[in-house]
Amino acid sequence: DRPIVIGQMLGEVEPEQLVRSSGLRPGDDLILTKGMGIEATAIIARDKREDLLKRGYTSSRIDRCADFLSDPGISAVRDAQVATQAGRVTAMHDPTEGGVATGLYELASASDVGLDINGDALLLMEETDQLCAEYGLDPFGIISSGAMLIGADPASTEDIVHALARAGIAAS
């Protein structure tokens, strides 16, 4: 009932600067930027505005959720740039389709490693958590454009997280 636009980009990179989703190694740390469900939060707020108003949500709260497309935003380019400049990044993956759960699976599968994840430590904004509860959605499985899963050498993790924070990008 509305147009949908899909795009793809290609580019060139120096081989030594290429970070693949298949580069995760046993013992690496995982960092999640911005949080789960950024785009899903905006979609729900935009598509369910009238229903949310009926459920007691204020217009300003719905507007805040709808604005997740621009703040924190659905591009993870800056996240990747900051992380790779700050320390040893071994793998990166954009958990858009299928959310963070699928992104974690794809990282592990591509890298042929297992993962030990503390789900409670992953970033989840209050707005996203509440909308998921409202509509019976699992935050781990909703579209998460804007977030980035980053594999990091443990010796670099703290430097990467601090650099992201200095750049105004939340990370856990």
Give, region by region, the residue ranges found by the protein language model.
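Helix-biased detector of long, well-ordered alpha-helical tracts
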Residues: 1-172
